[in-house]
């Protein structure tokens, strides 16, 4: 029963991480109306990032109790406090708490599942990460129908309930033997993956408009892209678990095919399907690093993911519109070749 309780707690913790990520975009209209211009929101994002970096660092510690329940408690307090913040500067410390708690929740929420079910690590980590997508998708929908304060009160209450569910969670396991092989190919792969995922979500809409498609259609396809990303994690988990790196390379071949079709006006509309094939990549790489290198390596994985998701989409801003599909294809090809190298590294070790 304890393992089921911890599994439920991990699922809800990752759901709340999705809420944290989606909250600024979903709440921005309310913030603009209450606080005025959007320029002050930079304080929120800076504090959130600072808290996230520290939270991931603390999450590298093997001691899961009381760190994970405390992280959830801090997030609950931040959610409850946000409606009472009179200005952006007052929101900043609450954003710091969201980042601090969210970083620890992301590391331990994932790693706990992998340790509870090591023989099904790849499959269950993919499926439990569907929770993140649900949180990110439901946040704007909920804020469209609920008052801002009511939604945050519910989110805060859920964080406290989840904190109770993970009380007494066991410490992270140390590797039974010294890790063999290089970690860097896996870190670089995660950075390229998050960069590709973010660049597709941010810039392919611009490319569709350059091809003559309506802005509204681009928004619909972007929603489908995120939906397919979650479905890929859910539906492909069992297949990927049988031979993870080989399966990921096969999925990337499909992604490259779709990104070649992305050059043409009509077939470019198929790009959301790339989300379905990309879905299992992050959780599978997380599972492989956890099994091979242990819990302390997971912080580096999270930092690599954060760097890729920030830097690579930013570099796409330097490309002309016609360079967007070429850049996306080049990223997918580089990731495919890197995974081939990682597979050879595993065989040698």
Question: Which role fits each region the language model picked out?
Answer:
Residues 24-25, 182-230:
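Extracytoplasmic gate region of multi-pass secondary transporters
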Residues 43-59, 223-235:
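Central cavity-lining transmembrane alpha-helices of secondary-active solute carriers
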Residues 74-86, 254-264:
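C-terminal ends and interior cores of transmembrane alpha-helices
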Residues 96-130:
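Cytoplasmic helix-loop-helix junction between adjacent transmembrane helices
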Residues 104-117, 279-293:
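Intracellular juxtamembrane helix-capping segments at the cytosolic ends
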Residues 149-166, 324-340:
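Symmetry-related core transmembrane helices of the 12-TM Major Facilitator Superfamily/SLC fold
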Residues 246-285:
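C-terminal transmembrane helical hairpin of 12-TM major facilitator-type secondary transporters
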Residues 294-320, 328:
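A late C-terminal transmembrane helix in Major Facilitator Superfamily
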């Amino acid at each position: 029963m304890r393992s089921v309780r911890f599994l439920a707690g991990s699922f809800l913790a990752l759901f709340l991480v999705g809420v944290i990520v989606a909250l600024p975009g979903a709440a921005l209209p309310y913030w603009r109306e209450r606080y005025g211009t959007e320029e002050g929101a930079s304080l929120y994002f800076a504090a959130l990032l600072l808290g996230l970096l520290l939270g991931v660092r603390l999450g590298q510690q093997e001691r899961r109790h009381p760190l994970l329940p405390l992280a959830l408690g801090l997030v609950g307090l931040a959610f409850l406090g946000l409606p009472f913040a009179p200005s952006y500067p007052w929101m900043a410390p609450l954003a710091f708490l969201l980042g601090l708690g969210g970083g620890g929740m992301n590391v331990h929420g994932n790693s706990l599942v992998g340790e509870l079910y090591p023989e099904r690590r790849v499959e269950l980590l993919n499926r439990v990460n569907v929770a993140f997508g649900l949180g990110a998708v439901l946040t704007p929908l909920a804020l469209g129908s609920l008052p801002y304060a009511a939604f945050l009160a519910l989110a805060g209450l859920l964080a406290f309930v989840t904190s109770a569910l993970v009380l007494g969670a066991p410490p992270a396991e140390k590797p039974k033997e010294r890790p063999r092989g290089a970690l860097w190919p896996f870190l670089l792969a995660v950075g390229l993956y998050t960069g590709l995922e973010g660049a597709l979500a941010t810039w392919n809409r611009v490319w569709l408009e350059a091809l003559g498609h309506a802005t509204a259609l681009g928004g619909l396809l972007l929603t489908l892209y995120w939906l397919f990303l979650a479905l890929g994690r859910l539906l492909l988990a069992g297949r990927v678990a049988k031979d993870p790196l080989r399966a990921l390379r096969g999925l990337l071949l499909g992604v490259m095919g779709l990104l070649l079709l992305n050059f043409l006006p009509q077939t470019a509309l198929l790009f959301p399907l790339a989300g379905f094939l990309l879905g299992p990549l992050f959780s599978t790489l997380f599972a492989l690093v956890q099994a091979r290198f242990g819990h302390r390596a997971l912080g580096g994985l999270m930092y690599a993911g954060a760097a890729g998701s920030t830097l690579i989409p930013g570099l796409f801003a330097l490309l002309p519109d016609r360079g967007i599909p070429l850049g996306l294809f080049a990223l997918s090809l580089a990731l495919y070749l890197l995974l081939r190298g990682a597979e050879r590294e595993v065989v040698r070790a």
